[in-house]
């Protein structure tokens, strides 16, 4: 069975505001199965933003695990992320999951990978998924050369990614924390 895959998730931080958004396309091989999927969520009583890319079932499994780690560690984003990455790296079942998470709270943005990496972007811009590089490049240019809000930067960057990446569409969901 082919995996569901392909998406673009982007987070932009400017000042005390962070925005995280994603497109809505879900593909199975070369077929678009859905165009309005919700791959971005607010969790932990609306204090943490999460976006996911990769296999749909795998991403939901990781999202569930991440939420339980947040609860266990009282919302401490770095600690919950590191603990999830440890489990992901060492648990036989979790090691097979093919997905990535992009998470953010008021202070920190992190990318969590299946290799056990927990990465904090230097410039407050994080991106994952097949269109992530396009969106990240656009966001960097917009952040450095405009006064747009993080939400507007995410929206414009996802649009650019959707015009370039066949696995990314123009249906966006964007969440913010301020």
From Swiss-Prot:
PROSITE patterns noted in UniProt: PROTEASOME_BETA_2 (PS51476)
Disulfide-linked positions: none
Activity regulation: Allosterically activated by HslU binding.
GO annotation, cellular component aspect: HslUV protease complex; proteasome core complex
The EC number(s) this enzyme carries: 3.4.25.2
HAMAP family assigned: HslV
Function text: Protease subunit of a proteasome-like degradation complex believed to be a general protein degrading machinery.
Name of the featured protein: ATP-dependent protease subunit HslV
Gene that specifies this protein: hslV
